[in-house]
Design a protein with these regions (language model features):
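Short S/T/G/P-rich N-terminal loop/turn motif that feeds into the first structured element of a domain
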Residues: 1-57, 62-78, 87-108
C-alpha cells in the first residue's frame, strides 16, 4: 500500500475465472443469492462478464477499507465470492487494488 493511501480508504477486490457457457447460470444464481446478504464490511459488489472473452467472469467488490476486508476474512472459513465460483466449478484468481480517488455520481 502506498504512503498516500489512508488505512480507511476503500479497497477493490477482484475474483476472476473462466467458465464454460453451461456454468454461467450457476454463477449468476450463486451471485444473486449471495449479493442479497452483503457483509457489513462491503460497500458494493458486481458480477461482470468480459465482452471480448465471454468465458471470463469477475466479481468486483468495494470494501470499506483493507481492515474491513481482513475483518471479514477472519469471520469466515471461505469467502463468499470464492464459494460462488466454486459452485460453478471454477477456482477464481484473487487481486486487490487500493482506491486512490473517486468521482462523484452526477446528479440526475
Amino acid at each position: 500500500m502506498s504512503a498516500e493511501v489512508s488505512a480507511a480508504q476503500p479497497l477493490m477486490t477482484v475474483l476472476e475465472a473462466h467458465l464454460g457457457p453451461e456454468q454461467w447460470p450457476t454463477l449468476r444464481q450463486a451471485f444473486e443469492g449471495g449479493a442479497a446478504r452483503l457483509p457489513a464490511q462491503m460497500l458494493r459488489t458486481f458480477l461482470v462478464q468480459s465482452g471480448a472473452d465471454p468465458t471470463l467472469w469477475r466479481v468486483v467488490s468495494i470494501w470499506r477499507s483493507r481492515a474491513a476486508l481482513e475483518e471479514y476474512r477472519r469471520s469466515v472459513d471461505t469467502p463468499g465470492g470464492v464459494l460462488m465460483f466454486r459452485a460453478a466449478g471454477a477456482e477464481p484468481m484473487f487481486s486487490s487494488f487500493d482506491v486512490v480517488a473517486t468521482m462523484p455520481t452526477p446528479l440526475s
